[in-house]
From Swiss-Prot:
Site (Cleavage): K243, R244
Residue ranges of the TM segments: 57-77
Keyword Membrane set for record: yes
GO BP, one annotated term: negative regulation of amyloid precursor protein biosynthetic process
Any Gene Ontology CC annotation: lysosome
Location(s) in or outside the cell: Lysosome membrane; Cell membrane
UniProt keywords, alphabetically: Cell membrane, Cleavage on pair of basic residues, Disulfide bond, Glycoprotein, Lysosome, Membrane, Phosphoprotein, Signal-anchor, Transmembrane, Transmembrane helix
BRICHOS domain mapped to chain residues: 138-232
GO MF term (any one): ATP binding
Protein family membership: Belongs to the ITM2 family.
Membrane topology type: Single-pass type II membrane protein
Name of the protein: Integral membrane protein 2C
Amino acid sequence: MVKISFQPAVAGVKAEKADKAAASGPASASAPAAEILLTPAREERPPRHRSRKGGSVGGVCYLSMGMVVLLMGLVFASVYIYRYFFLAQLARDNFFHCGVLYEDSLSSQIRTRLELEEDVKIYLEENYERINVPVPQFGGGDPADIIHDFQRGLTAYHDISLDKCYVIELNTTIVLPPRNFWELLMNVKRGTYLPQTYIIQEEMVVTEHVRDKEALGSFIYHLCNGKDTYRLRRRATRRRINKRGAKNCNAIRHFENTFVVETLICGVV
């Protein structure tokens, strides 16, 4: 605390005050010196910067960015693993090279035991099957590529020997759906062949030439594009017959079930 005192004024002022004091009388006493007490001002301190709050916000931002980068890395790694490992494994699981032993009661009265091999590719998501039948070792049919398109409800046969395509409505009583066919082949994947089975025969006849192949769907279009393509009409499905009822027919033997099917395409142009 600072004490400030005011002393009496200069001589002129003192004389005036003396005259006034004499006029007022002796009763009046001399006034004491005026004093003012001043409290010293507080020391001004520079404002504190709230560095902690700003620093914490920046730290959260950096942490968030780091988490985003980490998550993006995990996503890209997952996509890579899915594409190059899972899909490759799935493709291997959907591809089958298999065969079946069956008794041939169609070619002769004496039942002979034959072997049929084929490569099967099943597309579960697209809901179609693709079958490749190589040249049979002991005759009994032509090599062929077959597509069963369950979305379109169509079957296409590409007779490799004739280099022609034939299209007909899908026969779901003979052809197993992709999921069921896949389960069947997975169950017998440990072995090389399916259990010994029998053969049935279906007969078809050529009806008309197909010009607009794009209307058949993309799968059949890619199979038959650039080839003469014809529509078929089904005549009959028979089992264990000893004599073929039609001449001028081409046979394709294949299986999409627990039995073998011989498809006769008659009236070939």
